[in-house]
Structures are given as C-alpha cells and as structure tokens.
C-alpha cells in the first residue's frame, strides 16, 4: 500500500485511488453533467474556451471542504482551501502543458464521471526538481490513469501538467480542488483572496 505523504514529499505528486466513491461520487458526477448540459460552453475559459467549466460551484465548494481532511492526510500538510473549478470535457479537447497560479499550490484533480465503455484519458505530469518513480512513467514524466473517484494530488505551481487531445471518449467530468499550505509562502491565498467564502472545516 502506498505511503501517500512520503511519495508526495519525494515526487511532488501522488495518485490517490478512490478518494471519493459510492453515492456521493454518483451525485457529484451527475450534477456536473447536468450543469454542463444546462449552461453550455464557457467562452471565458482561456485554456479550453468551448467547453463547459465552472468556478466555485456551490456543490463543488462543499466537496472541497469534505475532502480537506483526506487531502491533509495524503500530503502530510495543514491546508487552507482556495477555490474549485470543474470542466466537462468533450472529444478533441486538449490541455496544454502548464503550471498553475499561487492559489493552486496543492491541487487535486478528481475524475468524476465518464462512459465506462471508453478508455481512460491520461494526465501527464512532470517536475525535474523531484525524484521519479519509474513505475509511474518513463524519465521525468508520469502518466496518471484515473478511474472514476481516483485523484491526482500534485504541487500545481511546481509540476507541469497537461493532457493530449481527447480521443479516448466523448465526455468526461473532472473537478480541480485547490489548496495552499497553511505554513507555506502562499498562505495568504486562502479562499482565493475572497474573504467570506464558506468552508466549515476550519471556521
């Protein structure tokens, strides 16, 4: 069984299988699909402008709060939540290689829903500052294959990450839950610098 905090400390990322499951996973995934159907593409999303995406959806904010204890256990860090974002990807979407802004110091990318008859869409991650474990990829690049309920936890400001064009399926819901280290250089980004956001775990 993987030692999540140790692996995260040594590599800057770790895969957490089944961080969410059961009826809660079903509920959140169905919510994401329905919101995408009702709202349509978000043209203000500069990374993938023609795909449904949502900042701080209330359901995801509560999921953010719900998973905080698991995130702290997996990383070995005390964390503040910052913000949430999710997309419902479509065929041919591509996420270019990038690093994230300070509010994404510690991030979780969670697979919520896709057609189980379709192949898993990989996430690639690399960070030359960290030692690599060969089982997760060749050289300095890791390839994460996430089933529904699985998550990639990573240092978003340090690890470059990307997804190649989505050819494996037709629709996939993915949520990104972002945190900062309470004792780190970006602690002032708590709540994404929007005071008054609701997070019950630390209030």
Regions found by a protein language model. Give the residues of each.
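Short, charged beta-turn/beta-strand-edge "cap" motif at the junction between a beta-strand
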Residues: 157-161, 166
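Catalytic core of non-heme Fe(II) oxygenases with the double-stranded beta-helix
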Residues: 91-157, 170-173, 182-194
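A short coil-to-beta-strand element that immediately follows conserved catalytic motifs
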Residues: 76-85
